[in-house]
Amino acid sequence: MNKIDFVVTWVDGNDPVWKEKKSRYDGSVSTSKQSMNSVKAYREWGTFKYWFRGVERFAPWVNKVYLVTDQQRPSWLDINSEKLVLVDHTEIICNDCLPVFSANPIESNIHRIPGLSEHFVFFNDDMYLTAPVEPTDFFSEDGLPKYNTALSPIIPERYGTGNFQINDMEIVTSYFSRNEILKNGQFFDPKQGLKSIVKSLLYRNSQFICGFWESHLPYPLLKSTMDLIWEKEKAVLGRTSASRFRNPSDTNVWLFKYWQIASGQYAVGNPKLGRLFSLDNAGPDFWNLLNSGKYKIMCINDVYDIKDEEKVMQEFIAAMKNLLPDKSTFEL
């Protein structure tokens, strides 16, 4: 197995310097796009140290951990940690596009990180390792990224991610025909799991490829695939890179995953590896589940309408501390 790096992006939306910088550009966001760029997108829960603790405890085999930020670093972070590499936006995004306050341009350029391995796993900072993982959870023995997927319609929510998925699929389907995608996609491999197979059966006779189901779990990616798509779609990805705030015309990181699926250059992963959860449903049962080891990965997603944010935040931190009480070597 080749070296595997982890890449994670992070922003401290409470940082007054960052907030002042963002305020200089807020006027450029039209009213129709303001909800797409709400405070929720930048909220810092104080749980990021547990992301690092999870990596050290549950993935000690990782080669390097690249933390991508906009001239920020957590106060508790040990920048001299052996496996840690800090990456500033200026190292991967052209100066004419900076500053950016959207994940889309950042994620579209992570392959430019100096020294990044060909095989890497991209994490959002709400994707936590909660039980031991192995390299083979992310890549096959011959180096293909592992995914679970299904044919699934894209949901066009006004302030959701559907616009990005449509833009991603528009690119993918311009290079791969419906029949090629059905042949390459491995949608009916038993390892996909019954639920995914049934979903794909429902949509396989559609005239067009309706979209791929998205798990919202970490993304195993190949640097060479990102290079290839940039070579083919430089204009589109260049526009996303110049998108200071989230814009309905953006692509996102799923494009690179979808390309692997459409081309057949992926292996089917474990459908029970992890799951997406939302903090608006947090309660005793959820916090117990977090500590149960049932899932190796849990994406714990922030939402707009949490009723008692302070209470949920305290319970969130307490549950993570219970799971990962010991400092990691990434901490001072």
UniProtKB/Swiss-Prot annotation:
This protein's UniProt keywords: Exopolysaccharide synthesis, Transferase
The keyword Mitochondrion belongs to this UniProt entry's keyword annotation: no
Record carries keyword Chaperone: no
Any GO BP annotation: polysaccharide biosynthetic process
GO molecular function: transferase activity, transferring phosphorus-containing groups
InterPro entries assigned to the protein according to its UniProt record, in alphabetical order: Stealth, Stealth_CR1, Stealth_CR2, Stealth_CR3
Enzyme nomenclature, EC number: 2.7.-.-
Family: Belongs to the stealth family.
Miscellaneous note of the record: Stealth proteins are part of a protein family that is conserved from bacteria to higher eukaryotes. Family members were first identified in microbes as proteins that help pathogens to elude the host innate immune system. Microbial stealth proteins are involved in the biosynthesis of exopolysaccharides. Stealth proteins are predicted to function as hexose-1-phosphoryltransferases.
Name the record gives this protein: Capsular polysaccharide phosphotransferase WcwK
